Amino acid sequence: MLRRIAALSAIVLAAAAPLQAQAYVYPALQPSRIAEREYNFALADMGDGFGTGLIFQWREGLGNPKLQFTLDAGFADPDAPNADARLLIGGGLAYQLTSATTDMPFDIVLAGGLGLTTGDDVTTVRVPFGAAIGHRFPLEGDIAITPFVHPRLSWDRISFNGNSDSDTNLNVDIGANFEFKPQMAIRVAAALGDDDAVALSFAWTPKGLRK
């Protein structure tokens, strides 16, 4: 029992100093172009004792060619001994603000959402908003690479055993999307700033829905 209390205390202290929490801590993995439909499977090292997470992301166009809905779902295994796995869930909207042209070479996506993490009586709510900025470079054949940055500001709130606290945090994702097949890509990103984390993912776009 004492070991479990110590493990819970370690999680709370790590998450509340000062509220270094996302809908757990992982890169958004949002490239600089929205998708009509995309399924993204990610493995993340969440850093700062938060452990390893498995995340599924579903991105879906909303009929408007500039709008996209995103759903995140997954779980994390904290590093603290005897700590329970934590459920991760979130949703958001993305808007294609600009597309690259000869005059303005960057694709820009505005993205915001709401994320929830719960487990071991600790609940974290995160409301992020930012912009993914990048450029797609076609290479040989179907191969292309899109480096991107994604600065975002978030309001985070953590609750434990009737107590709660909140803070505003700034993070910047630096990443790249590597397309190696018409419907397949490998995506890697690191989140830097108030929270540090890295993630590697496989993204699949169903045939006929590739942008």
Question: Where are these predicted regions, by residue range?
Answer:
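Outer-membrane beta-barrel transmembrane domain signature
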Residues: 22-40, 47-50, 61-64, 97, ...
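Non-membrane alpha-helical segments in proteins
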Residues: 55-57, 72-76, 110-113
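Surface-exposed strand-loop-strand hairpins of Gram-negative outer-membrane beta-barrel proteins
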Residues: 43-55, 75-79
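Bacterial N-terminal signal peptides that target proteins for export
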Residues: 1-9
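Short coil/turn segments at secondary-structure boundaries
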Residues: 14, 80-81, 121
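Bacterial Sec-dependent signal peptides at the C-terminal "C-region" and cleavage site
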Residues: 16-22
